[in-house]
Amino acid sequence: MPEGPEIRRAADNLEAAIKGKPLTDVWFAFPQLKTYQSQLIGQHVTHVETRGKALLTHFSNDLTLYSHNQLYGVWRVVDTSEEPQTTRVLRVKLQTADKTILLYSASDIEMLRPEQLTTHPFLQRVGPDVLDPNLTPEVVKERLLSPRFRNRQFAGLLLDQAFLAGLGNYLRVEILWQVGLTGNHKAKDLNAAQLDALAHALLEIPRFSYATRGQVDENKHHGALFRFKVFHRDGELCERCGGIIEKTTLSSRPFYWCPGCQH
């Protein structure tokens, strides 16, 4: 499943295609959304916001389209004259004079009014987004030490969107390798230096991935570009200590780590 950096890249692509352009055609597959089709004609997308793995497409009439791709949903950008060839099921079409964005296969789609943005179950539950430029290491440190999270092992905590939105499995293993910790550690057991390093890594690594990577299968090293240190590298040598990277399962997900320098 795509993680925060990939979701934000997708949002950037959608914005670049249709932001600020009048909508000439709008179509929704779900009957409960049909009434909004005519309300959106002539309106425009003001911005596309990410909340972890959910997208919020904001319109100029104050409506907001909530969508969560889950495992199978995918957005596509096409020329308006193009007829995409795909076996996927179309759920949403937002068309402008030159570009159209299409959402396929997703099932978690709703239209929200402004007051619903603060009461929607997922949006209420999700924590601060790691790609939010206003989120600071100090706030992350406070969350790590809060009664709600301080006793939880990082193996599960770093996958919990209620802690920080936008983290996922590859970010989990890369962050823990960066700070030399294991999935079994808990925030309450860290010293001040470890806690500070973790709080910074929880923001810096996702933001670096977003800025320089964007696709899960891009694992090339060009200068300072993001590359995996341990993810999918079991059996290889750790570049930090020379140990052998191992693979196990933690919180029902593959976990990659170096026993030589993560302890």
Curated annotation (Swiss-Prot):
Source organism, top-level taxon: Bacteria
Pfam families in the cross-refs: Fapy_DNA_glyco, H2TH, zf-FPG_IleRS
Disulfide bonds: none
Residues annotated as the enzyme's active site: P2 (schiff-base intermediate with dna), E3 (proton donor), K53 (proton donor), R253 (proton donor)
Function comment: Involved in base excision repair of DNA damaged by oxidation or by mutagenic agents. Acts as a DNA glycosylase that recognizes and removes damaged bases. Has a preference for oxidized pyrimidines, such as thymine glycol, 5,6-dihydrouracil and 5,6-dihydrothymine. Has AP (apurinic/apyrimidinic) lyase activity and introduces nicks in the DNA strand. Cleaves the DNA backbone by beta-delta elimination to generate a single-strand break at the site of the removed base with both 3'- and 5'-phosphates.
The family this protein is said to belong to: Belongs to the FPG family.
The protein's name in its UniProt record: Endonuclease 8
Organism: Escherichia coli (strain 55989 / EAEC)
